[in-house]
């Protein structure tokens, strides 16, 4: 192995957060600016040391959207991974070739005003919205798109469209 392929994957978790109406939360990355392409994503973040992935996803939700008013619906039982493009590897100091992720489906139990992007000192997101699960692959940066396509398939049962 040479170059980026010799680097390890960074372990992290992702949250597919569904409203009671079956929509999924997407948030706009604050560091890319409002006019950037593919600036919307699902909450995700690193696993600290030997932290349990289920605990990590709750911590990440608190850090990124200011709430843990959720219930676990399901998870993808295996690790999903993607490789960063070369410019992203370089941007992060060539420490990781990409990310390996555990994805969780969760139901939001609170009200929209409980989602607070400014709950912590350095917000990752500057805007959020509820959207259709089927729309998330088109919102994702191309290197994450296969993961979001998998989420749209595997978590479709949590995306009720009857307005309930």
Curated annotation (Swiss-Prot):
Short sequence motif named Nudix box, residue ranges: 45-66
MF terms in GO: bis(5'-adenosyl)-pentaphosphatase activity; guanosine-3',5'-bis(diphosphate) 3'-diphosphatase activity
Entry keywords, A to Z: Hydrolase
Top-rank lineage group of the source organism: Bacteria
Cofactor requirements of the protein: a divalent metal cation
Annotated ranges, domain Nudix hydrolase: 8-153
Assigned EC number: 3.6.1.-
Annotated Gene3D superfamilies: Nucleoside Triphosphate Pyrophosphohydrolase
Family recorded in the similarity comment: Belongs to the Nudix hydrolase family. RppH subfamily.
Name of this protein: RNA pyrophosphohydrolase
Organism for this UniProt entry: Acidiphilium cryptum (strain JF-5)
Name of the gene encoding the protein in the UniProt record: rppH
């Amino acid at each position: 192995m040479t170059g980026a392929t010799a680097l390890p994957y960074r372990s992290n978790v992702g949250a597919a957060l569904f409203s009671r109406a079956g929509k999924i939360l997407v948030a706009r990355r604050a560091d890319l600016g409002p006019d950037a392409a593919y600036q919307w994503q699902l909450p995700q973040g690193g696993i600290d040391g030997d932290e349990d992935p289920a605990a990590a996803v709750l911590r990440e939700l608190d850090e990124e959207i200011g709430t843990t008013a959720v219930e676990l619906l399901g998870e993808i039982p295996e690790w999903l991974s993607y490789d960063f493009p070369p410019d992203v590897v370089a941007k992060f100091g060539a420490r990781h070739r990409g990310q390996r992720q555990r994805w969780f489906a969760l139901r939001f139990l609170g009200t929209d005003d409980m989602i607070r992007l400014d709950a912590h000192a350095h917000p990752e997101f500057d805007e959020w919205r509820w959207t259709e699960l089927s729309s998330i692959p088109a919102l994702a940066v191309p290197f994450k798109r296969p993961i979001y396509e998998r989420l749209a398939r595997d978590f479709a049962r949590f995306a009720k469209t009857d307005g309930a």
